[in-house]
A protein has these predicted regions:
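Domain-level signature for soluble enzymes in the chorismate/prephenate branch of the shikimate pathway
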Residues: 1-304
Length: 304
C-alpha cells in the first residue's frame, strides 16, 4: 500500500515465499480491496491492527460489511517512526524551522506525545501513507516540512532523520493480513480463525451466549471487538479471532452452534497465526473429540 518505504512493504519483505509475486503498489486500503475484488490482483495485503491505536477500522469494516475475502495469513512487524525532513532543515535540539508535519493519520496518532511537546505549533497534514509523505517532501523539495515515516523512507527519498523513534510507546507493532478469494489455507498446527457475529435484535445476553460457546469448548479468544452494523443506532456486530482452524472438529462444532443460534455469522478465514499459543490452555484435542463422538454414536445405536 503506497509507494516504496511503507511499513506494508517492510512487512511483505518478511515473507520470502511471496517474493515470486509481482507487487502492485496502491494508494489506500480501499484501493487494494477494490483491486482484489475486481480481479486486478490475486492477493491483497493490508494493515488491520496496531498495538497503540487498535483496529484499522477501514480494513475491519470492509471485511465485515463490504467484501467476501478470506484471510490467508497474518504478519506482525515492529514499527519505528522517525521524524525526517530535507537535509539541514532541523536537528533534534532545534525544531523551530518545521512548520508542517505530514504523515498517515494512524502514524500521527501514534506520535501524539512527541508532537504535543516538541512541535505544538506545527500544522499537521494527513497523507495516504507514511512513505507518500516522505516522497512528497523529497520530490517537491518542501522546506520547513517534516514527515513521520519509517527509517527506510528517509534513505529512499533522500531525507535526513531529525528525530528517531518518536512513537509514544516503544513496543509498537502493526498486524497485517494477506487476503484472497475463495480459498482457505490448510491447517498448520498454529492457526487462528476470524469471524463476525451479528447481534440478534432485542435479545438480552447475546454476547454472553456467544462467549459461552467458546468457553464450553475451551477455545481461547485472542480478539473481541464490537462495531456498529450501519443498520441503525444501537445495532452492533462482534469481530472475533480465536485459536484453531475450521478443519478442527471442535472449531467446526463451535461455528455450527453459533450459526444455529445467532444465524448471522460471517467467516473471515482460518489461517496461520503470527505468534504461538499465548493462553497456555490446551483446547479439546481431536482425539478427545473423536472419542466422545464415537461414544455418542454407540449410545444412539441403542435406540430402537
Amino acid at each position: 500500500m503506497g509507494p516504496r518505504g511503507t511499513f506494508t512493504e517492510a512487512a511483505l519483505a518478511t515473507q520470502p515465499d511471496l517474493s515470486q509475486c509481482t507487487p502492485v503498489p496502491l494508494i489506500s486500503v480501499p484501493e487494494v480491496l477494490s483491486a482484489l475484488d475486481d480481479g486486478a490482483v490475486d492477493y491483497g495485503f493490508v494493515p488491520v491492527e496496531n498495538a497503540i491505536e487498535g483496529a484499522v477500522n477501514v480494513t475491519q469494516d470492509a471485511l465485515a460489511f463490504d467484501f467476501d475475502f478470506l484471510i490467508q495469513r497474518e504478519v506482525v512487524v515492529n514499527v519505528q517512526l522517525d521524524l525526517m525532513a530535507l537535509p539541514g532543515t532541523a536537528t533534534a535540539d532545534d525544531l523551530t524551522a518545521i512548520h508542517t508535519v505530514l504523515s498517515f493519520p494512524v502514524a500521527i496518532a501514534q506520535c501524539r506525545a512527541f508532537l504535543h511537546t516538541q512541535l505544538p505549533d506545527a500544522e499537521i497534514e494527513a497523507a495516504t501513507s507514511t512513505a507518500l509523505a516522505a516522497r512528497r517532501i523529497g520530490e517537491e523539495q518542501l522546506t520547513g516540512v517534516a514527515a513521520i515515516a519509517s527509517p527506510t523512507a528517509a534513505e529512499i527519498y533522500g531525507l535526513e532523520t531529525v528525530a528517531a523513534g518518536i512513537e509514544d510507546h516503544r513496543e509498537n507493532q502493526t498486524r497485517f493480513l494477506l487476503l484472497a478469494k475463495n480459498q482457505v489455507p490448510p491447517a498448520s498446527g498454529n492457526d487462528k480463525t476470524s469471524i463476525v457475529v451479528f447481534q440478534q435484535q432485542n435479545e438480552p445476553g447475546s454476547l454472553l451466549g456467544i462467549l459461552m460457546e467458546f468457553e464450553a469448548r475451551r477455545i481461547d479468544l485472542s480478539r473481541l471487538e464490537s462495531r456498529p452494523t450501519r443498520r441503525g443506532l444501537g445495532e452492533y456486530c462482534f469481530l472475533l479471532d480465536f485459536e484453531g482452524h475450521i478443519s478442527d472438529e471442535v472449531v467446526a462444532d463451535c461455528l455450527r452452534a453459533l450459526k444455529m443460534k445467532q444465524r448471522d455469522v460471517k467467516f473471515l478465514g482460518s489461517f496461520p497465526a503470527a505468534n504461538g499459543n499465548s493462553s497456555g490452555r490446551e483446547p479439546i484435542s481431536e482425539e478427545a473429540w473423536t472419542s466422545s463422538d464415537d461414544w455418542l454414536k454407540s449410545l444412539r445405536r441403542l435406540v430402537r
